């Protein structure tokens, strides 16, 4: 890219909601600035905000209006992200802000992702406070979630750096809708990511997400091939929208060919929400068919989610096919992995594992972050 892209400045002191941001350039008209953070490339006049509604042209520079602000903090099981092969059973301090750079009609977190009220992100915390809270709460990791952390990349990156200094892992739960110029700066600070691959056609992304598929595929390929990030993928299957067996076959073949067979794939059930309420939940049979398609394509770790299906929430050894992690909901029932290998046949198990699993279970603990400042 020949144009000069402004990167995030080093600003040690800030007022929440007014942190100067990065990844933008001046437009040729000399009036607008163009946000380069995501593939939309929103051109903003003074006072304008982008599609995400949280990145603003303020006095000729991008300002992150949700930096230091959150819609809430909660300690969750890591499997809820979902990440089934990243320190299983451990607790993760989760938080998000407001806004999103996609416009999914089926969004399950639409009260936050589609919020136009930045003041709804009423809790404030700096990165060091979040890292300290994670340590004091006994959390193995911090997750940037609930809404897409890409649009608050500066806040996520600074928090990830503080967490790394404190010995805490970081997780991005994201759509992967990020530009090439911002991609490495964001993901190089993350230890794990669950990326939503929402469908596998451009028509689906255009009609249901107001976005494009190709940038997501580019992000997934970059994470798998050029980063050390532990990657898992979620595919929410929506009846009549992205549930074609042929499309699922193409998606699974692409994952194996481009990312490798060891990337876990979660097939998640749709429930009517936000604007997409004209159809029922995903039939369990559709999830089971998708599971079988993925196995036949060669994906080694496959899960179902948002349904009661205990058998397909276990982690199976790709060698002997025995369950090396048995689960009941978010509770770990048994753990047969030692030094990254199956204890039954010694085949390697892909993931990031401690010697013993965590014991957080299914608990959900809301956190008042002000108590940790």
Model-derived segments and spans:
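A generic "binding-loop/recognition-motif" signal
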Residues: 48, 100, 201
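Cys/His/Pro-rich metal-binding microdomains
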Residues: 36-39, 53, 98-101, 105-108, ...
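Auxiliary Fe-S-binding modules of radical SAM enzymes
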Residues: 1-46, 240-373
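Generic structural "secondary-structure junction" signal
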Residues: 35, 44, 53-54, 64-65, ...
């Amino acid at each position: 890219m020949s144009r000069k892209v402004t990167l995030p400045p080093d600003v040690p002191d800030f007022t929440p909601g007014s942190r100067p941001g990065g990844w933008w350039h001046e437009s040729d008209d000399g009036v607008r600035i163009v946000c380069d953070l995501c593939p939309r490339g929103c051109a903003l006049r003074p006072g304008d905000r982008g599609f995400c509604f949280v990145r603003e042209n303020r006095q000729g520079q991008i300002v992150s209006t949700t930096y230091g602000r959150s819609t809430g903090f909660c300690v969750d099981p890591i499997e809820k992200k979902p990440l089934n092969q990243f320190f299983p059973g451990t607790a993760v301090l989760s938080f998000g802000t407001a806004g999103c750079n996609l416009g999914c009609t089926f969004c399950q977190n639409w009260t936050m992702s589609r919020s136009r009220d930045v003041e709804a992100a009423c809790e404030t915390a700096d990165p060091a406070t979040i890292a300290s809270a994670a340590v004091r709460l006994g959390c193995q990791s911090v997750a940037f979630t609930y809404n897409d952390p890409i649009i608050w990349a500066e806040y996520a990156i600074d928090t990830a750096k503080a967490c790394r200094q404190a010995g805490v892992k970081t997780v991005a739960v994201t759509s992967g809708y990020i530009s090439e110029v911002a991609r490495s700066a964001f993901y190089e600070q993350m230890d794990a990511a669950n990326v939503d691959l929402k469908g596998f056609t451009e028509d689906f992304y255009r009609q249901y997400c107001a976005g494009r598929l190709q940038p997501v595929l580019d992000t997934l390929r970059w994470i798998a091939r050029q980063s050390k990030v532990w990657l898992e993928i979620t595919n929410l299957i929506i009846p009549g929208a992205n549930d074609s067996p042929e499309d699922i076959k193409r998606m699974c073949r692409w994952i194996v060919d481009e990312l490798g067979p060891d990337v876990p794939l979660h097939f998640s059930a749709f429930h009517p929400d936000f604007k997409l309420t004209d159809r029922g939940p995903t039939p369990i049979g559709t999830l089971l068919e998708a599971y079988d398609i993925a196995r036949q394509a060669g994906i080694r770790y496959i899960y179902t989610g948002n349904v009661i299906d205990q058998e397909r929430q276990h982690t199976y050894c790709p060698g002997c096919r025995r369950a090396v992690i048995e689960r009941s909901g978010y509770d770990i029932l048994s753990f047969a992995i030692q030094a990254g290998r199956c204890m039954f046949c010694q085949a390697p198990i892909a993931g990031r594992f401690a010697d013993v699993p965590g014991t957080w279970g299914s608990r959900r603990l809301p956190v008042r972050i002000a108590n940790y400042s």
